[in-house]
Amino acid sequence: MADHGEQDALAAGLSGALTSFGHRLMARVYYADTDFSGVVYHARYLEFFERGRSDFLRLAGVHHTELADGKHGEKIVWVVRRMEIDFRASAKIDDILTIETRTKDISGARITMAQQLKRGDEMLVEAKVEAAIIGENGRPRRFPKDWIEAFMPEVV
């Protein structure tokens, strides 16, 4: 029976893993991810990237539910301000994908992340995402200092 990359995905764990560059998450392409032509529907890549960013935050100690519950003195949420996507090749049903997330820059209330979605060594999609945190009033909030340390990989 073919492996399809399952062993790597199982070894990585449900939330992926923090790496020297940031975060890596494995995901399988299901029938529901594809369009009538049999390839992954373009909007689904946004969902794969969202999972990568969310699990990176989770493993770095930042949990969406705690933010929404006011752990930092007020309810805050993440928002995507800008996204650039470069589609190079299509993923297909049963593909095992690797979603890599890196913090490119973080300052004040803004973070820029670079994401890559690969099938094996083949680059399928790249994204540059600018996000921020906002309070209940919709205004930007500064990142806590410990977040900045958690999101920036160690320089080797």
Language-model-derived ranges and their functions:
Residues A17, K118-M123:
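A short, structured loop/turn motif at beta-sheet edges
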